[in-house]
């Protein structure tokens, strides 16, 4: 399979990053490693060079968001004539043999109208099935882009900076008559947020809750409101999906240990939406 990959970093743990990259790098012809950290992690270039000779590390001395790095990777993949591009987060990995299984399934079916392939990042909620299914959205990590169709879909929206970048792109895939295809039998090891224990206000039982850093609250509410009220072409199903994602913040508003900062970022994000502020906070 003529495929490159990109993994986007932000203050990575070198050991964990290396362990994750090993699970998919052998199936790639090139891996672009784009570092969004404000300060460079000592020893990272040396560590990456030992993993695979086809790894290219780039440090930008600034965090300019995930969308800009994804667009750079798509541009590089197109310029170097790769057919597909794997997009990964630094904390994501595949089970042994799963990445090879993933790419083999894509090759075997010779899909022509699929702009984006994805995997199952929530096996507790999405039951694995042998046959792939169309999806409204796919997360960035673990997705494989059909480079030839990106021009029709359009590039990733750099105004969003971080959150909803993958969802907004997925919506445009559908709007342009293409398909997001999920292989739910391929499980991605991926953390969607920080898990903390919280007591239910309904039955007082303690359960694990997904929370986010306060700055993520800012981007989730700002970008979510943008998609709901200002983005063009979103149908009712897409807007319902955006609302579902925004509602995830309820755990942060109740259980996040940094409540003061969470609420500051919430109101700051709402104000940013009202004042049409885009990009980085």
Region annotations inferred by a language model:
Residues 34-45, 92:
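A conserved acidic beta->alpha catalytic loop
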Residues 95-129:
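Conserved donor NDP-sugar-binding/catalytic core segment of glycosyltransferases
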Residues 149, 159-192:
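A short, conserved alpha-helix in the catalytic core of glycosyltransferases
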Residues 29-39, 58-60:
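Short beta-strand/loop segment that forms part of the nucleotide-sugar
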Residues 228-281:
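Non-catalytic, C-terminal membrane-associated alpha-helical segments of glycosyltransferases
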Residues 60-77:
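Glycine-rich, basic loop-to-helix element that forms the pyrophosphate-binding segment
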Residues 82-91:
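Short beta-strand-to-loop acidic/aromatic patch adjacent to the donor-nucleotide binding site
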Residues 7-27:
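Short, well-formed alpha-helical segments that are part of the catalytic scaffolds
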């Amino acid at each position: 399979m003529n495929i490159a990959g990109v993994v986007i970093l932000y203050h990575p743990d070198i050991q964990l990053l290396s362990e994750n990259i090993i699970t998919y790098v052998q199936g790639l012809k090139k891996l672009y490693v784009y570092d969004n950290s404000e300060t460079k992690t000592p020893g990272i270039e040396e560590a990456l060079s030992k993993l695979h000779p086809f790894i290219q590390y780039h440090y930008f001395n600034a965090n300019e968001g995930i969308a800009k790095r994804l667009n750079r990777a798509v541009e590089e993949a197109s310029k170097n004539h790769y057919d597909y591009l794997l997009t990964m987060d630094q904390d994501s990995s595949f089970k042994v043999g799963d990445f090879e299984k993933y790419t083999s399934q894509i090759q075997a079916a010779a899909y022509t109208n699929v702009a984006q392939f994805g995997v199952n990042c929530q096996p507790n909620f999405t039951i694995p099935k042998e046959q792939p299914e169309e999806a409204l959205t796919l997360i960035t990590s673990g997705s494989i882009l059909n480079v030839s169709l990106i021009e029709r879909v359009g590039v990733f929206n750099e105004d969003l900076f971080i959150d909803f970048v993958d969802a907004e792109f997925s919506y445009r895939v559908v709007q342009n008559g293409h398909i997001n295809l999920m292989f739910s039998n391929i499980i991605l090891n991926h953390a969607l947020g920080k898990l903390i224990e919280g007591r239910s206000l309904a039955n007082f039982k303690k359960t694990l809750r997904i929370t986010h850093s306060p700055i993520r609250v800012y981007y989730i509410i700002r970008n979510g409101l943008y998609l709901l009220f200002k983005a063009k072409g979103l149908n009712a199903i897409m807007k319902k999906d955006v609302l579902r994602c925004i509602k995830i913040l309820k755990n942060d508003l109740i259980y996040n240990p940094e409540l003061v900062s969470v609420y500051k970022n919430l109101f700051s994000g709402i104000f940013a939406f009202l004042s049409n502020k885009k990009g980085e906070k």
